[in-house]
């Protein structure tokens, strides 16, 4: 059984009926219930399709945060080969919320940076729920500089509610670390492709997403602040997160229309968590196409195109 979201209750009810019928058919081998099961399965798929055709921004936020949604380590396992992770920022400590290193993607050498949230209590604590500390962003800068030195394309996978806001992180220069990471991305003379695979929250996401090509999965979100944070500021009530999400234009569809991102990667029906391998494969195809579009361009051209991209975004939204 899936972990159903609250708005998926009609689908959940049908799926429960399907499981009950399958159990009865198994217990009473002489009873043929295949036609009834097939009918209910068709109704379930239709209900799911109808739901996902008209998701609200808040519902998309829930899908982006689904506990079973594939995270960076899932993408790494399926898309990357010969992975050589690097650890530490050479200044303070290692931060596992940001995974980084070198690997091969479809046979080509690349550098990678990915934000990992974890899948269970143990791994979520290990990765700090995907909220990186300053040393994580300084490690990211270290990888960026190595990628630039060796002429390796950089792939980044964004999935964070935001950078860690704790006192210790602020004492070690969280804002400066985020700013330096963003600036370092813009300086690179190698192709940079970023995919927002779940949440793209605030500066914690932007720090590794100032790429030549930025893609979002169909049901991911990308914003300067979480809906709960915006609701707390605007209405002093985090319970109004649904209202905030509706007005913030945080969905992939909104951001593609505003020309903030370069494309939307389709997800399987019902979200990436229902067919993880298919969702990851689609993301890999999008990354490959983005890299192919930059083949033959020299470093200065790649860098200038990145600068021009973000200057144009600033002008168009001013």
Curated annotation (Swiss-Prot):
Q: What GO cellular component is one of the record's annotations?
A: acetyl-CoA carboxylase complex
Question: GO molecular function terms here?
Answer: acetyl-CoA carboxylase activity; ATP binding; carboxyl- or carbamoyltransferase activity
Annotated ranges, domain CoA carboxyltransferase C-terminal: 43-293
The superkingdom listed in its UniProt entry is Bacteria
Q: Which PROSITE patterns match?
A: COA_CT_CTER (PS50989)
Question: Keyword Lipid metabolism, does the record have it?
Answer: yes
Which InterPro entries does the entry link to? Acetyl_CoA_COase_a_su, ClpP/crotonase-like_dom_sf, COA_CT_C
The reaction(s) this protein catalyses:
N(6)-carboxybiotinyl-L-lysyl-[protein] + acetyl-CoA = N(6)-biotinyl-L-lysyl-[protein] + malonyl-CoA
| EC top class named in words | transferase
**Any keyword Lipid biosynthesis?**
yes
Q: Which residues form a coiled coil?
A: none
Where does it localize? Cytoplasm
GO BP: fatty acid biosynthetic process; malonyl-CoA biosynthetic process
Q: What is its EC number?
A: 2.1.3.15
Family the entry assigns? Belongs to the AccA family.
Question: Subunit structure of this entry?
Answer: Acetyl-CoA carboxylase is a heterohexamer composed of biotin carboxyl carrier protein (AccB), biotin carboxylase (AccC) and two subunits each of ACCase subunit alpha (AccA) and ACCase subunit beta (AccD).
Name-wise, this protein is Acetyl-coenzyme A carboxylase carboxyl transferase subunit alpha
